[in-house]
């Protein structure tokens, strides 16, 4: 599969960041987790009660979404319509569910809309 153009990637990444934002907001409401969600441009920040954060941003030159969490730094690349970890192959929402659960201390399952 050829790489996307820069504008194609930016549109795809922007849509995915919006989807993540909506998904986290909905899941947090369902389990009464207190997560502050903020977005500025291509950076989505999730802040938890203990002050810890998860930061998700798009990296256009690499055509990846990068996630910084207490568990570490992770790179996700689009593959067959899904964002997968470039090292482990884990799907983005599975990984984010674990990171959000760890940092919120509430069992959170994220399912993309």
From Swiss-Prot:
Gene Ontology biological-process annotations: iron-sulfur cluster assembly
Pfam families xref list: Frataxin_Cyay
Keyword Lipid metabolism: no
Gene3D superfamilies the record matches: Frataxin/CyaY (3.30.920.10)
Matches recorded under CDD domains: Frataxin (cd00503)
UniProt feature coiled coil, ranges: none
InterPro entries, per database record: CyaY, Frataxin/CyaY, Frataxin/CyaY_sf, Frataxin_CS
Keywords, sorted A to Z: Iron, Metal-binding
Annotated S-S bridges: none
PROSITE patterns per record: FRATAXIN_1, FRATAXIN_2
Example of a GO MF term: ferric iron binding
UniProt GO cellular component terms: cytosol
The protein's role, per its UniProt record: Involved in iron-sulfur (Fe-S) cluster assembly. May act as a regulator of Fe-S biogenesis.
Cross-referenced HAMAP family: CyaY
Similarity-based family: Belongs to the frataxin family.
NCBIfam families xrefs: FeS_CyaY (TIGR03421)
PANTHER family: FRATAXIN, FRATAXIN, MITOCHONDRIAL
Protein name per Swiss-Prot or TrEMBL: Iron-sulfur cluster assembly protein CyaY
